[in-house]
Structures are given as C-alpha cells and as structure tokens.
C-alpha cells in the first residue's frame, strides 16, 4: 500500500461581493512602527549635522508635519483600498494612525521647544494672531482623544458604535491639517495636492454613506 503525502491545509477564502480580499504578505506591526520612525530619525540627523539650510527649525517643523499628514492620509486610505481593490491592510490602520499622532507631537514639540524656546507668551500670541497655528492647535486637540482611544480597551469601554462615531472626527483633523499646511506656506502647490487627496477620500466616504442611506447595496464588511 503506497504512502500518501500529507495534505496541506487550503487557505480559507473570504468572499466579499463576488471578490476575494487579496492576502498580502503579513508584515509584523512592530516593523511598521520601526519603518515609520525612519523619516524622523533621518531629519533629526540632518539637523544635528547642520544640513537643514538657513532656517533649520522651519525645515524640521515642515518635514515632521508633512510626514504626519502622509501617515494620516495613508490611514484614511486603508478602507477605500480594501473596498475598491480587495487589498486588505486593515491590520495596519491603527499603526498608521498612531504614527500620525507621534509625528504631530514631534512637529508640535519642535515648534514649542526648538523654535519658540517654550516662551509661553510668544506661543500664545502666535496661536491668537496666526490663523494657521490656531487651526493646527485645534487639529491637535481633536487628535488627542483619537490617539488615546486607539486601543482595544477603549473600544470595549466605549462600545463599538460610540468608538466609530468618535473616530469619524479624523476627517475633520485631515481637513484642518490641510488648511494648516496651506496657510503656512507661500507656494501652495504641495498642500493643494494633499488637499485634493483628502477631498477624494472624504468624497468617497460621503458618497458611500449617501448610497447606504438611500438603500443602495453596500457590502456589510465595507461599512467601516
């Protein structure tokens, strides 16, 4: 009697509206965090080497803020990417969101400590007089509770529905981030590009919500 080769378990398909979610190589989440901090380390290294140009503080602030916006957009793109292409990177959304917060904190600390030297009167005057700083601070205040509740314990305590309602404020944070960027530069080409991306993501979200409210067919697993 011939020996049979042991059969390997078949990968389980996850159907979704006639399509299967694409199984991507599973990168450990910790690696996402480590890779995410490389830009910050690089820019601080440039600063220590005195290679940030004539205004190093502004260059560092700009770079950290820009990376915060990039990570924010990446986190917002996770759900549309899954719904439109089947590419499922949902397990990395929290990491991208927290990286957004970490970069915003670094951006803010660079302004408060390195740029303003913790001069509270100068900082308060900036917040009151410069609209882009007022908008940036407002975005940070909204972002703080989102970062604090980016964990499973918060989901259990708040309940899934309340937690999702709270985290929809991230879209307002994205709008404020783009406005902050737009008003802080003289040449608006770069912030307009990122603003267009945010507008597309927000428009997609609103379109799906309207479709669902009107009784359109929206896959259950896409309602995130």
Regions picked out by a protein language model, each given a short descriptive name:
Residues 2-224:
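Membrane-embedded alpha-helical bundles that constitute the cytochrome b-like, heme-associated redox core
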């Amino acid at each position: 009697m011939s020996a049979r080769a042991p059969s390997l378990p078949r990968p389980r398909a996850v159907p979704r509206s006639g399509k299967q979610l694409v199984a991507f190589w599973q990168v450990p989440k910790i690696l996402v965090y480590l890779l995410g901090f490389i830009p910050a380390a690089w820019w601080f290294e440039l600063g220590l080497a005195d290679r940030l140009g004539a205004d190093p503080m502004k260059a560092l602030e700009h770079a950290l803020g820009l990376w915060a916006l990039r990570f924010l957009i990446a986190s917002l793109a996770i759900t549309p990417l899954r719904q439109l292409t089947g590419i499922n990177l949902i397990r990395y959304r929290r990491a991208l969101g927290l990286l957004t917060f970490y970069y915003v904190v670094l951006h803010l600390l660079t302004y408060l400590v390195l740029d303003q030297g913790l001069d509270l009167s100068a900082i308060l005057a900036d917040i009151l007089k410069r609209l882009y700083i007022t908008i940036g601070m407002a975005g940070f205040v909204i972002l703080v509770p989102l970062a604090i509740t980016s964990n499973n314990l918060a989901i259990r305590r708040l309940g899934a529905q309340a937690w999702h309602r709270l985290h929809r404020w991230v879209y307002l944070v994205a709008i404020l981030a783009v406005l902050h960027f737009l008003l802080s530069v003289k040449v608006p080409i770069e912030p307009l590009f990122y603003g267009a991306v945010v507008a597309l993501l927000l428009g997609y979200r609103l379109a799906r919500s309207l479709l669902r409210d009107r009784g359109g067919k929206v896959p259950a697993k896409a309602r995130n």
